[in-house]
Protein backbone atom coordinates (compact mmCIF):
# COMPACT_ATOMS: atom_id res chain seq x y z
CA UNK A 1 0.00 0.00 0.00
CA UNK A 2 1.07 3.54 -0.64
CA UNK A 3 1.86 5.63 2.44
CA UNK A 4 -0.97 7.94 3.39
CA UNK A 5 -0.33 11.63 2.74
CA UNK A 6 -1.32 13.69 5.76
CA UNK A 7 -2.50 17.28 5.53
CA UNK A 8 0.18 19.35 7.34
CA UNK A 9 -2.59 21.22 9.18
CA UNK A 10 -3.93 18.01 10.74
CA UNK A 11 -3.76 17.81 14.53
CA UNK A 12 -0.78 15.66 15.53
CA UNK A 13 -0.35 16.26 19.25
CA UNK A 14 -2.56 17.73 21.96
CA UNK A 15 0.15 19.17 24.19
CA UNK A 16 -0.93 20.35 27.62
CA UNK A 17 0.92 23.35 29.03
CA UNK A 18 2.68 23.05 32.38
CA UNK A 19 0.05 25.17 34.14
CA UNK A 20 2.46 27.18 36.29
CA UNK A 21 0.26 30.28 36.12
CA UNK A 22 -3.14 28.60 36.19
CA UNK A 23 -5.10 25.73 34.71
CA UNK A 24 -3.28 23.69 32.06
CA UNK A 25 -4.47 24.26 28.46
CA UNK A 26 -4.25 21.90 25.49
CA UNK A 27 -2.11 23.40 22.72
CA UNK A 28 -3.14 21.95 19.36
CA UNK A 29 0.08 21.09 17.52
CA UNK A 30 -0.19 20.15 13.86
CA UNK A 31 2.13 18.05 11.70
CA UNK A 32 3.39 21.35 10.26
CA UNK A 33 4.23 22.62 13.76
CA UNK A 34 6.23 19.50 14.62
CA UNK A 35 8.06 19.53 11.29
CA UNK A 36 8.98 23.20 11.74
CA UNK A 37 10.29 22.39 15.23
CA UNK A 38 12.27 19.42 13.88
CA UNK A 39 13.85 21.40 11.04
CA UNK A 40 14.80 24.24 13.40
CA UNK A 41 16.44 21.82 15.84
CA UNK A 42 18.50 20.18 13.11
CA UNK A 43 19.43 23.54 11.59
CA UNK A 44 20.31 25.32 14.83
CA UNK A 45 21.36 22.89 17.52
CA UNK A 46 22.18 19.26 16.81
CA UNK A 47 22.78 16.80 13.98
CA UNK A 48 22.06 13.28 15.27
CA UNK A 49 22.50 10.11 13.24
CA UNK A 50 21.93 6.37 13.69
CA UNK A 51 24.79 6.27 16.22
CA UNK A 52 23.15 8.91 18.43
CA UNK A 53 21.01 8.51 21.55
CA UNK A 54 18.35 10.74 23.09
CA UNK A 55 18.35 10.11 26.85
CA UNK A 56 15.00 11.04 28.40
CA UNK A 57 16.03 12.52 31.73
CA UNK A 58 13.11 14.96 31.73
CA UNK A 59 9.46 13.83 31.43
CA UNK A 60 8.52 12.63 27.96
CA UNK A 61 5.18 14.39 28.38
CA UNK A 62 7.04 17.69 28.19
CA UNK A 63 10.16 18.99 26.43
CA UNK A 64 12.03 15.72 26.23
CA UNK A 65 9.13 14.10 24.40
CA UNK A 66 8.93 16.95 21.92
CA UNK A 67 12.51 16.21 20.90
CA UNK A 68 11.64 12.69 19.79
CA UNK A 69 10.81 13.70 16.14
CA UNK A 70 14.25 15.04 15.07
CA UNK A 71 16.00 12.02 16.55
CA UNK A 72 13.55 9.52 15.06
CA UNK A 73 13.97 11.25 11.70
CA UNK A 74 17.72 10.58 11.85
CA UNK A 75 17.41 7.01 13.15
CA UNK A 76 18.72 7.72 16.65
CA UNK A 77 17.82 5.53 19.62
CA UNK A 78 15.53 6.58 22.47
CA UNK A 79 16.83 5.79 25.96
CA UNK A 80 14.25 5.72 28.76
CA UNK A 81 15.48 5.41 32.39
CA UNK A 82 14.06 2.36 34.15
CA UNK A 83 13.31 4.53 37.20
CA UNK A 84 10.89 6.62 35.09
CA UNK A 85 12.28 9.62 36.98
CA UNK A 86 15.30 11.89 36.93
CA UNK A 87 18.02 10.29 39.02
CA UNK A 88 21.34 12.05 38.30
CA UNK A 89 23.54 8.99 38.79
CA UNK A 90 21.27 6.80 36.67
CA UNK A 91 21.27 9.45 33.94
CA UNK A 92 25.07 9.62 33.88
CA UNK A 93 25.33 5.81 33.94
CA UNK A 94 23.06 5.61 30.89
CA UNK A 95 25.18 8.19 29.08
CA UNK A 96 28.30 6.12 29.79
CA UNK A 97 26.60 3.06 28.27
CA UNK A 98 25.06 4.55 25.10
CA UNK A 99 26.80 6.35 22.22
CA UNK A 100 26.41 9.98 21.13
CA UNK A 101 24.09 11.07 23.93
CA UNK A 102 21.92 14.18 23.92
CA UNK A 103 19.25 15.21 26.42
CA UNK A 104 16.78 17.94 27.24
CA UNK A 105 16.94 18.91 30.92
CA UNK A 106 15.41 21.60 33.09
CA UNK A 107 17.98 23.92 34.74
CA UNK A 108 17.25 22.37 38.14
CA UNK A 109 18.21 18.97 36.70
CA UNK A 110 21.47 20.36 35.34
CA UNK A 111 22.28 21.68 38.82
CA UNK A 112 21.67 18.21 40.29
CA UNK A 113 24.08 16.67 37.77
CA UNK A 114 26.76 19.13 38.84
CA UNK A 115 26.13 18.32 42.50
CA UNK A 116 27.06 14.66 41.93
CA UNK A 117 30.68 15.71 41.44
CA UNK A 118 31.04 13.12 38.67
CA UNK A 119 32.92 13.93 35.46
CA UNK A 120 31.08 14.23 32.18
CA UNK A 121 30.78 10.92 30.33
CA UNK A 122 32.69 11.21 27.08
CA UNK A 123 29.60 10.04 25.22
CA UNK A 124 27.47 12.91 26.58
CA UNK A 125 27.57 15.28 23.63
CA UNK A 126 24.75 17.78 24.14
CA UNK A 127 22.57 19.04 26.98
CA UNK A 128 19.73 21.27 25.85
CA UNK A 129 18.41 23.24 28.82
CA UNK A 130 15.15 25.16 29.08
CA UNK A 131 11.76 25.19 30.73
CA UNK A 132 12.83 27.59 33.48
CA UNK A 133 15.43 30.22 34.30
CA UNK A 134 19.09 29.21 34.05
CA UNK A 135 20.96 31.69 36.20
CA UNK A 136 24.39 32.80 34.99
CA UNK A 137 26.23 31.57 38.09
CA UNK A 138 24.60 28.13 37.77
CA UNK A 139 25.43 27.95 34.07
CA UNK A 140 29.08 28.79 34.69
CA UNK A 141 29.32 26.02 37.28
CA UNK A 142 27.77 23.57 34.82
CA UNK A 143 30.17 24.54 32.03
CA UNK A 144 33.13 24.24 34.41
CA UNK A 145 32.00 20.72 35.33
CA UNK A 146 30.94 19.40 31.91
CA UNK A 147 32.53 21.63 29.30
CA UNK A 148 31.02 23.38 26.25
CA UNK A 149 28.19 20.92 25.61
CA UNK A 150 25.28 23.21 26.50
CA UNK A 151 22.54 24.53 24.24
CA UNK A 152 19.78 26.82 25.48
CA UNK A 153 16.27 27.02 24.15
CA UNK A 154 13.41 29.32 24.92
CA UNK A 155 10.02 28.12 23.80
CA UNK A 156 6.53 27.25 24.98
CA UNK A 157 4.10 24.44 24.38
CA UNK A 158 2.33 26.87 22.05
CA UNK A 159 5.51 27.19 19.93
CA UNK A 160 7.16 23.91 20.89
CA UNK A 161 10.77 24.36 21.94
CA UNK A 162 11.34 26.95 19.23
CA UNK A 163 11.36 30.70 19.84
CA UNK A 164 14.99 31.65 20.58
CA UNK A 165 18.16 29.84 21.57
CA UNK A 166 21.91 29.78 22.17
CA UNK A 167 24.14 27.27 20.38
CA UNK A 168 27.15 25.56 21.97
CA UNK A 169 29.50 28.09 20.38
CA UNK A 170 27.49 30.99 21.84
CA UNK A 171 28.38 29.78 25.35
CA UNK A 172 32.14 29.99 24.75
CA UNK A 173 34.34 33.09 25.21
CA UNK A 174 31.38 35.37 25.74
CA UNK A 175 30.06 37.78 28.36
CA UNK A 176 27.49 37.45 31.12
CA UNK A 177 24.91 39.42 29.12
CA UNK A 178 24.89 36.67 26.47
CA UNK A 179 24.90 33.83 29.02
CA UNK A 180 22.02 35.52 30.84
CA UNK A 181 20.00 35.91 27.65
CA UNK A 182 17.80 33.38 25.88
CA UNK A 183 19.64 33.90 22.61
CA UNK A 184 18.36 34.97 19.22
CA UNK A 185 15.47 34.00 16.98
CA UNK A 186 15.42 30.39 15.81
CA UNK A 187 15.34 29.35 12.16
CA UNK A 188 11.93 29.96 10.59
CA UNK A 189 10.67 32.07 13.49
CA UNK A 190 10.05 35.82 13.69
CA UNK A 191 10.40 37.25 17.20
CA UNK A 192 9.50 40.76 18.37
CA UNK A 193 9.09 42.70 21.60
CA UNK A 194 5.99 44.91 21.75
CA UNK A 195 4.77 47.69 24.01
CA UNK A 196 1.25 47.48 25.46
CA UNK A 197 -0.07 49.54 22.54
CA UNK A 198 1.37 47.05 20.04
CA UNK A 199 4.26 49.21 18.84
CA UNK A 200 7.73 47.61 18.58
CA UNK A 201 10.10 48.18 21.49
CA UNK A 202 13.56 49.53 20.75
CA UNK A 203 16.74 47.79 21.90
CA UNK A 204 16.89 47.85 25.69
CA UNK A 205 13.17 48.54 26.12
CA UNK A 206 11.06 45.92 27.88
CA UNK A 207 7.82 44.63 26.40
CA UNK A 208 5.90 41.44 25.71
CA UNK A 209 7.65 38.82 23.61
CA UNK A 210 5.66 37.68 20.56
CA UNK A 211 6.53 35.26 17.77
CA UNK A 212 5.15 33.88 14.52
CA UNK A 213 6.00 31.11 12.09
CA UNK A 214 5.05 27.57 11.14
CA UNK A 215 5.94 26.41 14.63
CA UNK A 216 3.05 28.31 16.28
CA UNK A 217 0.06 26.19 17.38
CA UNK A 218 -3.39 26.32 15.79
CA UNK A 219 -5.01 27.26 19.11
CA UNK A 220 -6.16 25.77 22.40
CA UNK A 221 -8.37 22.71 22.52
CA UNK A 222 -11.98 23.65 23.30
CA UNK A 223 -10.91 27.07 24.57
CA UNK A 224 -11.75 29.76 22.02
CA UNK A 225 -11.46 32.59 24.53
CA UNK A 226 -7.88 31.71 25.47
CA UNK A 227 -7.04 31.23 21.78
CA UNK A 228 -8.29 34.74 20.89
CA UNK A 229 -6.24 36.28 23.70
CA UNK A 230 -3.07 34.38 22.79
CA UNK A 231 -3.13 34.44 18.97
CA UNK A 232 -3.52 37.98 17.63
CA UNK A 233 -2.83 39.23 14.10
CA UNK A 234 -0.74 36.16 13.33
CA UNK A 235 1.43 36.56 16.43
CA UNK A 236 1.64 34.32 19.47
CA UNK A 237 1.53 36.47 22.61
CA UNK A 238 3.81 34.59 24.98
CA UNK A 239 2.92 36.44 28.18
CA UNK A 240 6.66 36.77 28.82
CA UNK A 241 8.39 40.12 29.24
CA UNK A 242 11.77 40.71 27.68
CA UNK A 243 14.08 43.00 25.74
CA UNK A 244 16.48 42.77 22.82
CA UNK A 245 19.98 44.22 22.99
CA UNK A 246 21.78 45.89 20.09
CA UNK A 247 23.25 42.53 19.04
CA UNK A 248 19.87 40.82 18.72
CA UNK A 249 20.10 38.76 21.91
CA UNK A 250 16.80 38.48 23.77
CA UNK A 251 16.79 38.65 27.56
CA UNK A 252 13.79 37.18 29.34
CA UNK A 253 12.72 39.41 32.22
CA UNK A 254 9.72 37.56 33.63
CA UNK A 255 6.21 36.34 33.06
CA UNK A 256 3.96 39.37 32.76
CA UNK A 257 1.86 37.90 35.60
CA UNK A 258 4.94 37.69 37.84
CA UNK A 259 6.14 41.29 37.45
CA UNK A 260 5.91 43.14 40.77
CA UNK A 261 4.51 46.67 40.49
CA UNK A 262 5.54 48.62 43.58
CA UNK A 263 4.84 52.33 43.85
CA UNK A 264 4.31 52.48 40.09
CA UNK A 265 7.69 50.89 39.28
CA UNK A 266 8.10 47.52 37.59
CA UNK A 267 10.36 45.09 39.44
CA UNK A 268 11.36 41.92 37.61
CA UNK A 269 11.73 38.97 40.01
CA UNK A 270 14.31 37.19 37.88
CA UNK A 271 16.75 40.09 38.26
CA UNK A 272 16.48 39.92 42.05
CA UNK A 273 16.68 36.11 42.07
CA UNK A 274 19.81 36.16 39.92
CA UNK A 275 21.62 38.39 42.40
CA UNK A 276 20.37 36.49 45.45
CA UNK A 277 21.75 33.27 43.99
CA UNK A 278 25.20 34.83 43.71
CA UNK A 279 25.38 34.76 47.52
CA UNK A 280 27.09 31.56 48.76
CA UNK A 281 24.48 31.18 51.49
CA UNK A 282 21.57 30.88 49.04
CA UNK A 283 20.72 27.55 47.39
CA UNK A 284 17.37 28.55 45.87
CA UNK A 285 15.45 31.81 45.63
CA UNK A 286 11.93 32.66 44.50
CA UNK A 287 10.73 36.26 44.38
CA UNK A 288 7.06 37.29 44.27
CA UNK A 289 4.90 40.33 45.00
CA UNK A 290 2.74 40.62 48.11
CA UNK A 291 -0.22 43.04 48.37
CA UNK A 292 0.56 46.25 50.25
CA UNK A 293 -1.81 49.13 51.07
CA UNK A 294 0.82 51.84 50.63
CA UNK A 295 2.84 50.56 47.66
CA UNK A 296 0.34 48.31 45.87
CA UNK A 297 2.82 45.43 46.05
CA UNK A 298 6.10 44.81 47.84
CA UNK A 299 8.84 42.33 47.02
CA UNK A 300 9.06 39.14 49.08
CA UNK A 301 11.88 36.61 48.63
CA UNK A 302 11.53 32.94 49.52
CA UNK A 303 14.96 31.59 50.41
CA UNK A 304 16.40 28.10 50.65
CA UNK A 305 19.72 28.55 52.42
CA UNK A 306 21.52 29.87 55.47
CA UNK A 307 22.17 33.54 54.65
CA UNK A 308 20.55 35.95 57.11
CA UNK A 309 18.27 38.81 56.02
CA UNK A 310 20.97 41.30 57.02
CA UNK A 311 23.56 39.53 54.88
CA UNK A 312 21.18 39.42 51.93
CA UNK A 313 20.27 43.10 52.27
CA UNK A 314 23.94 44.06 52.23
CA UNK A 315 24.59 41.80 49.25
CA UNK A 316 21.66 43.22 47.27
CA UNK A 317 22.18 46.89 48.04
CA UNK A 318 25.68 46.67 46.57
CA UNK A 319 24.24 45.43 43.29
CA UNK A 320 20.71 46.74 42.60
CA UNK A 321 18.56 49.77 43.32
CA UNK A 322 17.18 50.00 46.86
CA UNK A 323 13.52 49.92 45.75
CA UNK A 324 14.03 46.44 44.26
CA UNK A 325 15.23 44.96 47.55
CA UNK A 326 12.82 42.46 49.20
CA UNK A 327 10.88 43.96 52.07
CA UNK A 328 11.01 40.59 53.79
CA UNK A 329 12.46 37.11 53.48
CA UNK A 330 10.64 33.83 54.00
CA UNK A 331 12.82 30.78 54.68
CA UNK A 332 11.60 27.39 53.42
CA UNK A 333 13.13 23.94 52.93
CA UNK A 334 12.44 23.76 49.19
CA UNK A 335 10.74 25.87 46.53
CA UNK A 336 7.51 24.30 45.22
CA UNK A 337 7.97 22.96 41.70
CA UNK A 338 5.93 21.06 39.16
CA UNK A 339 7.06 17.75 37.67
CA UNK A 340 9.10 19.60 35.04
CA UNK A 341 11.18 21.48 37.61
CA UNK A 342 9.44 24.85 37.17
CA UNK A 343 8.99 26.92 40.32
CA UNK A 344 5.30 27.43 41.10
CA UNK A 345 5.11 31.14 41.84
CA UNK A 346 1.38 30.98 42.45
CA UNK A 347 1.97 28.63 45.40
CA UNK A 348 4.48 31.07 46.84
CA UNK A 349 1.92 33.86 46.54
CA UNK A 350 -0.72 31.66 48.16
CA UNK A 351 1.55 31.22 51.18
CA UNK A 352 1.45 34.98 51.66
CA UNK A 353 -2.34 35.24 51.40
Where are these regions (language model features)?
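Conserved pre-ATP/AMP-binding loop-to-beta segment of ANL
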Residues: 1-16, 23, 47-53
Amino acid sequence: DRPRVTDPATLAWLFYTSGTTGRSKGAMLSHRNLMAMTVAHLADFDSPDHNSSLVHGAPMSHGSGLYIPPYVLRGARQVIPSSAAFEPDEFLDLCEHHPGCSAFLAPTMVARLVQTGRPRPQTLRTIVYGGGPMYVDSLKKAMAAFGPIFVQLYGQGEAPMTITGLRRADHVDTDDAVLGSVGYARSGVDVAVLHEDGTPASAGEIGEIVCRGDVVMAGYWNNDDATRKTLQDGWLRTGDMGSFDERGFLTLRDRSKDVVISGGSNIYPREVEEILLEHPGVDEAGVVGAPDEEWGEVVVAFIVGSASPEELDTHLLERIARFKRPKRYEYIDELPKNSYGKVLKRELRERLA
